[in-house]
Amino acid sequence: SDGRFYRVSVDQAELGYAARYVGYAHNQETFKFLMDPMLQNGAEKVSAMGYGNAINALSDAEGGIAKYFSQRFAQVTNPPLDSLRESDGMTLRVCLGEKPYLGKNRGKQIVIDTPILTSVEMSTLQGQKLVAVEHFCLLYHAFSEDTERNEESLTAKIDEVATAVSKFAEERGGIAVLSDRLMDSTNACLPMILVISAINQKLIETGVRLKVSLVVESGQIASSHHIACALGFGASAVYPVACLLYTSPSPRDR
């Protein structure tokens, strides 16, 4: 009830792998065009520029909030951004924890080389003692047969999580881990991007945005587009649960 989250392994969870993927709004397209190419080649699948599918508002497969931000046109930069040849001026490094400000030295920060965390990095982050870490659950009680009650439940939970993170920032500050790992048949995932945006706005309104970094542990992340949306709306780092789950089950489970 306080928004906190206590870790258990996926094997102990109520839902199986297939049900969890459905709950995270993934389908065959997610695996065929996003996850499989990345796992096989270490890179995204090369395809046509732009987004040729029906816009999400007119699709019968909702597919998550991130799809509402898919571009319908090709966009390039001139000159192109090149993180390899321009490494002196570009970096993916991220500092987690309360940001330092003039006249105040509130503590230390943790520097990571990339905003995409591995299992080892996530465990290390949560086990360290230099920066305070608090967990917040991104789940709500879903009412699949009653849209009005479902909307009320979802909205109330988003407000609750945003308030809890703001309180953590005011009282302690540090790293807020937002997780939907413990989804089950009763408690559905809060839309990741909506929650990140709501928390970000709440922290700005209360004047404590620089006192906390948001780390998102979510199964809703399955592509670079999902990552870009999460980071763009206020997250500092992500831990893509579904992608890592997809590498772990046996071929029979997959």
Region locations from a protein language model:
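Extended, highly charged accessory segments
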Residues: S1-V161, S166, E170
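Alpha/beta enzyme core
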Residues: A162-V177, L210, A228-C229
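Hydrophobic faces of well-ordered beta-strands that scaffold small-molecule active sites
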Residues: A176, L214-E217, V238
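Glycine-rich, proline-tolerant flexible connector loops at the mouths of alpha/beta enzymes
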Residues: L178-L190
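Alpha-helix-loop-beta-strand connector modules within alpha/beta enzyme cores
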Residues: P191-L210
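Catalytic cores of alpha/beta
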Residues: A222-F233
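Glycine-rich phosphate-binding active-site loops on the catalytic face of alpha/beta enzymes
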Residues: G234-L245
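Conserved small/polar residues in nucleotide/adenosyl-binding loops
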Residues: Y246-D253
